[in-house]
Every structure is written in structure tokens, then in C-alpha cells.
């Protein structure tokens, strides 16, 4: 039974090693903050913020050096808060060109093959004109004065973004299509051998 628990832990180890808000929003000329949570096992690794439709081809904007010091590249800064396993990215002086797909990523040193990927999570950045009176209900930073209907819509949209981020994660795909079938096969073999 301990073997089964150990194998199950191995299967789920990389699945949720890095999580993020899914989507954040801000105004032109303003700033926004993104916080991504990572597994404590990645403490001391370099973290970075990159832009692009895919995590494997995104262009690095700013990165840490493995310490907790804030690093800056133009209007974008990143800081690794190792004490609570959080990466904080701040984008300032926003323009509509800043809207798009970004990634929180962790630089790992044990990747040797094309099947492995750095742990990453997608974050959609929305930038709205400064004349907009309130942010749409799809933002991660809703004011509490919104009606309950907008809050329910926001919660549903955020869940969909987070679910899509999980499903597009290579760790999740490896879990579902490789580790889980292998685990189930080994579990069946154990039960079959014990039955004899």
C-alpha cells in the first residue's frame, strides 16, 4: 500500500507546481500586479516572466537571479518571495500593446530532453483605455461594489482561465497521458500478483 501512495505522489508531483491568476487587467497608463504561486521545492531557482502564445517560444522580459532581490527591465519588475513561494511581477505605464499572453516560468537545471519543459503557467493580460469607468467583470481585481451577478461571472471566467492554464500545462499532459496510465498498469499488476 505504501508503494501505491508513493507512485500516486510521483504522478501528481509536477501537475500543480506553479499556479497563477489566469487573467489580470489594468488601464492604459496604470500598472498591474501578477502573483504566481510555486511549489517550495523550487526555492532558489531562477524565475522569469515572458511573453508569447506558447511557453516554449515565449520571449523573456525579466528574470530573477535565484535570490529575492527585485529585478527590473524597463517598466516591468519581478521579485521572488521565497518565504511564501510567490513570484510577483509588476507592469507599469501600461499601453494597449501590453495586452496579450504572458507566462510565469521557473528555470530548471535538470532538463536534458525535448520532452521536458520548465514549469510554467499562462497569464492573460488585458489593458483597457483609461477612460473606461470600471473594469469588466472578467478581471482578477474586481472592486467589491460590483453587483453579485458580475461577481458570479467573474468567478466563472476566472475558473475557466485557470482550468485552461492547467490543461495546457505540459506537466498536466504528462500526468494524464504518461504517468497516470503507467501508475494504473502497475497497480493492476500488483493486484493481479497478490490475487495469485
Swiss-Prot record:
Residues 18-122 form the Ig-like V-type domain. GO terms for cellular component: plasma membrane. InterPro entries: CD300_family_receptors, Ig-like_dom_sf, Ig-like_fold, Ig_sub, Ig_V-set. GO terms for biological process: immune system process. Residues 1-17 form the signal peptide. Keywords: Cell membrane, Disulfide bond, Glycoprotein, Immunity, Immunoglobulin domain, Membrane, Receptor, Signal, Transmembrane, Transmembrane helix. Residues 18-171 are extracellular. Glycans are attached at residue 84. It is a single-pass type I membrane protein. Disulfide bonds join 36-104. The keyword Phosphoprotein does not apply. The keyword Transit peptide does not apply. Residues 193-196 are cytoplasmic. The chain crosses the membrane at residues 172-192. Pfam families: V-set. CDD domains: IgV_pIgR_like. Its main location: membrane. It is found in: Cell membrane. Probably acts as an activating receptor. Belongs to the CD300 family. Interacts with TYROBP. This is CMRF35-like molecule 2.
Amino acid at each position: 500500500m505504501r508503494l501505491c501512495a508513493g507512485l500516486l505522489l510521483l504522478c501528481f508531483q509536477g501537475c500543480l507546481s506553479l499556479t497563477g491568476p489566469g487573467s489580470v487587467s489594468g488601464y492604459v497608463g496604470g500598472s498591474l500586479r501578477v502573483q504566481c504561486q510555486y511549489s517550495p521545492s523550487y526555492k532558489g531557482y531562477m524565475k522569469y516572466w515572458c511573453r508569447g502564445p506558447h511557453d516554449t517560444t515565449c520571449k523573456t522580459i525579466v528574470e530573477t537571479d535565484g535570490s529575492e532581490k527585485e529585478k527590473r527591465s524597463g517598466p516591468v519588475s519581478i521579485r521572488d518571495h521565497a518565504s511564501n513561494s510567490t513570484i510577483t511581477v509588476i507592469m507599469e505605464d501600461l499601453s494597449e500593446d501590453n495586452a496579450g499572453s504572458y507566462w510565469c516560468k521557473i528555470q530548471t537545471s535538470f532538463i536534458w530532453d525535448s520532452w521536458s519543459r520548465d514549469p510554467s503557467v499562462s497569464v492573460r493580460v488585458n489593458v483597457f483605455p483609461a477612460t473606461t469607468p470600471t473594469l469588466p467583470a472578467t478581471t482578477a481585481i474586481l472592486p467589491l461594489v460590483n453587483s453579485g451577478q458580475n461577481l458570479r461571472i467573474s468567478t466563472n471566467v476566472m475558473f475557466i482561465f485557470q482550468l485552461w492554464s492547467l490543461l495546457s500545462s505540459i506537466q498536466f499532459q504528462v500526468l494524464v497521458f504518461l504517468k497516470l496510465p503507467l501508475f494504473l498498469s502497475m497497480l493492476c499488476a500488483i493486484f493481479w500478483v497478490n490475487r495469485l
